[in-house]
Amino acid sequence: MKLDIKKTFSNRSDRVKGIDFHPTEPWVLTTLYSGRVELWNYETQVEVRSIQVTETPVRAGKFIARKNWIIVGSDDFRIRVFNYNTGEKVVDFEAHPDYIRSIAVHPTKPYVLSGSDDLTVKLWNWENNWALEQTFEGHEHFVMCVAFNPKDPSTFASGCLDRTVKVWSLGQSTPNFTLTTGQERGVNYVDYYPLPDKPYMITASDDLTIKIWDYQTKSCVATLEGHMSNVSFAVFHPTLPIIISGSEDGTLKIWNSSTYKVEKTLNVGLERSWCIATHPTGRKNYIASGFDNGFTVLSLGNDEPTLSLDPVGKLVWSGGKNAAASDIFTAVIRGNEEVEQDEPLSLQTKELGSVDVFPQSLAHSPNGRFVTVVGDGEYVIYTALAWRNKAFGKCQDFVWGPDSNSYALIDETGQIKYYKNFKEVTSWSVPMHSAIDRLFSGALLGVKSDGFVYFFDWDNGTLVRRIDVNAKDVIWSDNGELVMIVNTNSNGDEASGYTLLFNKDAYLEAANNGNIDDSEGVDEAFDVLYELSESITSGKWVGDVFIFTTATNRLNYFVGGKTYNLAHYTKEMYLLGYLARDNKVYLADREVHVYGYEISLEVLEFQTLTLRGEIEEAIENVLPNVEGKDSLTKIARFLEGQEYYEEALNISPDQDQKFELALKVGQLTLARDLLTDESAEMKWRALGDASLQRFNFKLAVEAFTNAHDLESLFLLHSSFNNKEGLVTLAKDAERAGKFNLAFNAYWIAGDIQGAKDLLIKSQRFSEAAFLGSTYGLGDDAVNDIVTKWKENLILNGKNTVSERVCGAEGLPGSSSSGDAQPLIDLDSTPAPEQADENKEAEVEDSEFKESNSEAVEAEKKEEEAPQQQQSEQQPEQGEAVPEPVEEES
């Protein structure tokens, strides 16, 4: 049995005694020996909540998801309930006079069972204020485990160290029956088989054994041995045909529930194993186990169902909800099923029977006549209609050839064998020298080995090309020209896809000339076209279009190097295929609910022709057959992505897209016609920007006006000195509360009155007063502003400042006559041309003055000479005045 086991999350902590999964959230609950309870998100690996419950060990804990609770039982004899969203304690009561070992929650009723070292099991009702409904007595030692029967929740089983398992019914005080296990030591764990096909339960004991029981015949079906120490637990997996057991020897063992043989032994390095949980819905086959040094969450595979769809709509699958994994079912998709959008199809299901292996893959032959079931190292080929065995054998992997009469497989020795008409072709072989991991079907035989993919010719086994890629899947188009290789990253998750073109002619030419490298093949055989950076979970080719589902629950298609979304889903979906008869792709979820999504074949054909450079043919021959606005919109979006803007503009029925395309191609008038006055401001602004780029200023003004883009209008009006437009803009800006923009508009327009009124409106009285005085608004107007200024100062408690403010007579530009003269007269300010003339006049006047400078200077000196002489005779200030001296006679 192949199990893709991955460690999803592991955390070190104190000893984990109890563990449980939340049914819908990615949470795991752990109860610790230290008395703590921890809630972890195993997808983000972040602790959601931690609660210190008590100082004694907490041995049991469960989610009660429908109430948003967790319930725990501990060695202080108490049961506590917490709201896991808030951490608030809901209830706390003493449940037993001894340690509480196990807790079980009824799947539908408000009941909780608790098993204890006091030798009893008790039933509690949370809707009745956690009243004790019933006490079940009869065990002679510690009750280690209690479990409800999922097929009949009115009964439950209890496992005890007295080496018995008792089965009880709610409401009855005595057990229905007691199983004496025959195990040499006590029973640590008991669990029911979850599916309806087998009346089994399982027990784990300190005598190192695991026993499977038929509780109807009360007989032991099988005994499993292999652990080296006490077995702490053993459980049936809810979806896989396996049993998981854990022991104090530190290992987890995975057993085949059909053959009861060990398939895998795991040691995660966390010492002794104490507890187990399986995801209640089987999501990604999660299991979680608690150990001495922490806990781990493991994924035993993905959620992809095992199914196959043939070319005419016949579906075959194994397992499913409430069915064993080996059960095979079929249904026919007729294409006329009427369902609501996003609702599954109502299909008539028929059971074909069961197979002797655990089916790990189902595959129809290319024509749908045969179905292969592969699992447990075997393959069986059945006829699709009667489900009769056609061929069988041992294999590690199996793929169909290009026709329904040929196939290849990996045999027990690891060699590839080729069969034609159900007989081995002994003369056929492939030159492989390393271990083979997997085979891929298609136009060429794909072989995965050692991190490479090898492509071989089906006819003669010749190596066509070796490609260095760690492939998860290889998907070929129907015409054998295109191939999508789904790559995996280092974690084994889907990382990306590569679209390759197979050059068959180049390969045949090299083969004819004998130019094939033995280790690399033909270099020119494949060309890489595109890389698809998506997490691909499943995919199919429809023509040259690749349709696929993603890990983010999207249905997309990839064409021309671009990805387009078709639909979103709330859960993970897997692509079954495309039926041209219905124009639909079909998908299924993990429970094999089938969904259909309509897709236009004409749209795909149009895109295919366009990518081949035949766009004229696509427009002439295919486009007239395309119906519906959605299909035309998809084509227009595709053409836009391929930069066919003119063609997309002519085709698109979507007004928004046409507007965007009209801007791209410069058809501004068309873009204007597509808009209305009520259109979004963003579109008008985009039109305005495009108009500016093409110097269409008139259209730019109209667009910015409708967009209410005042800043852009200010740029335009000020650039063209449009005073009327600036005044209108200023008023609009003032109404919009954009006072700075409004003032600038008034200022550039020369509207001093408007600027003054705006300053007063915004209570900028000081600036308004100086503005009015400087630009000659009149003393009366200035005094009115000053009065308001003073009143505002007084109102704000600035009386001293108010007293110092003068009126118009103290401001620059005032006059005694009351008619203020402006210091700067905007109206009389000369224009640039007049200013140049004045400057020339000043130059001429300076030359005239310079020519007469000598005469002027001489005249000035004559006038200043006697004055200078007189001044020299006078003493300076502060100098002593000498006494007059008499002349000698």
From Swiss-Prot:
The keyword Phosphoprotein applies. The keyword Cytoplasm applies. Present with 129000 molecules/cell in log phase SD medium. Residues 806-889 are annotated as: Disordered. GO terms for molecular function: structural molecule activity; ubiquitin binding. Keywords: Cytoplasm, Cytoplasmic vesicle, ER-Golgi transport, Golgi apparatus, Membrane, Phosphoprotein, Protein transport, Repeat, Transport, WD repeat. Belongs to the WD repeat COPB2 family. This is Coatomer subunit beta'. Residues 866-879 have a biased composition (Low complexity). Pfam families: B-prop_COPA_B_2nd, TPR_COPA_B, WD40. The coatomer is a cytosolic protein complex that binds to dilysine motifs and reversibly associates with Golgi non-clathrin-coated vesicles, which further mediate biosynthetic protein transport from the ER, via the Golgi up to the trans Golgi network. Coatomer complex is required for budding from Golgi membranes, and is essential for the retrograde Golgi-to-ER transport of dilysine-tagged proteins. One of its GO terms (cellular component) is Golgi membrane. It is a peripheral membrane protein. It is found in: Cytoplasm; Golgi apparatus membrane; Cytoplasmic vesicle, COPI-coated vesicle membrane. Its main location: cytoplasm. GO terms for biological process: endoplasmic reticulum to Golgi vesicle-mediated transport; intra-Golgi vesicle-mediated transport; intracellular mRNA localization; intracellular protein transport; late endosome to vacuole transport via multivesicular body sorting pathway; retrograde vesicle-mediated transport, Golgi to endoplasmic reticulum. It comes from the Eukaryota. Oligomeric complex that consists of at least the alpha, beta, beta', gamma, delta, epsilon and zeta subunits. Interacts with the ESCRT-0 subunit VPS27. Residues 836-864 have a biased composition (Basic and acidic residues). WD repeats lie at residues 11-41, 53-83, 95-125, 138-169, 182-214, 226-256. The modification Phosphoserine is found at S326. The gene is SEC27. CDD domains: Coatomer_WDAD (cd22938), WD40 (cd00200).
